[in-house]
A protein has these predicted regions:
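Conserved glycine-rich Rossmann-like NAD(P)H-binding loop of the short-chain dehydrogenase/reductase
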Residues: 25-39
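Substrate-binding pocket helix/loop in short-chain dehydrogenase/reductase
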Residues: 91-93, 100-103
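Conserved glycine-rich cofactor-binding loop
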Residues: 9-10
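The beta1-alpha1 cofactor-binding region of Rossmann-like NAD(H)/NADP(H)-dependent oxidoreductases
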Residues: 54-65, 98
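Residue(s) in the substrate-gating loop at a strand-loop-helix junction
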Residues: 136
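Active-site helix of classical SDR
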Residues: 116, 152
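C-terminal helical subdomain
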Residues: 172, 176-177, 196-225
Length: 225
């Protein structure tokens, strides 16, 4: 089977790519950072067939063109893992940055839609496929100053439920995984490179690791139909 993973260059996406490659999935790695994609390509090619696509999920033309360019050996996507996502800032709504809001909505919501739109038609035609949308506990509960990020993840949860309703008649499985605190670049990106502030997010407890979520994803997509 072939799995396409967005946001594959770090964190949960990278960990998932490694787990799937070691468990006989062919993998299509998608991300913005070509150097990191190449490193991961070289690492995983010893286990399985690997293809990389470089694009930003916010760019719908690039998404369509890149996914449309997949060679025949990778063109049939059995599993789509919508993992690309981000948080920017942690400010009360009155102090929020419009640029931060745009980034979160464009990546977390619209980017997920653009990638899904490029792949779902082939799943419908085959009447098979599995989509995993990576949400967050923020999809279930809003926390102080999380306003727009939490809204974007609530949207992912709603889209996940809507996709399931729409695609179930075609034999396509759709599910979401909503991680809590996971030790990734997430907080460093949120705080724009402030590593000290990012480290404080995990102070006083042991966060999950990306591999923990990757194991859950692998478990879910390998359950018998």
């Amino acid at each position: 089977k072939t799995a396409l993973i967005t946001g594959a260059t770090s964190g949960i996406g990278k960990a998932t790519a490694i787990v799937l490659a070691k468990n006989n999935f062919n993998v299509v790695l998608c991300g913005r950072r070509e150097d990191r994609l190449q490193e991961l390509y070289e690492e995983l090619s010893q286990y399985t067939s690997v293809h990389t696509l470089t694009f930003d999920v916010r760019n719908k033309e690039a998404v369509a063109a890149q996914i449309g360019s997949l060679p025949e050996a990778f063109a049939t996507i059995d599993v789509l893992i919508n993992n690309a996502g981000n948080a920017h800032g942690l400010d009360p709504i009155q102090n929020g940055s419009e640029d931060d809001w745009d980034a979160m909505i464009d990546i977390n919501v619209k980017g997920l839609l653009y990638v899904s739109k490029a792949i779902i038609p082939q799943m419908v035609a085959r009447k098979s496929g599995h989509i995993i949308n990576i949400g967050s506990t923020a999809a279930k509960e809003v926390y102080p100053n999380g306003n727009v990020y939490c809204a974007s993840k609530h949207a992912v949860d709603a889209l996940n439920q809507g996709m399931r309703m729409d695609l179930n008649p075609f034999g396509i499985r759709v599910g979401a995984i909503h991680p809590g605190m996971v030790a990734t670049e997430f907080s460093e990106v949120r705080f724009k490179g402030d590593t000290e502030r990012a480290a404080n997010v995990y102070k006083g407890f042991t966060p999950l690791q990306p591999e923990d979520i990757a194991d859950i994803i692998h478990f879910v997509i390998t359950r018998p139909y």
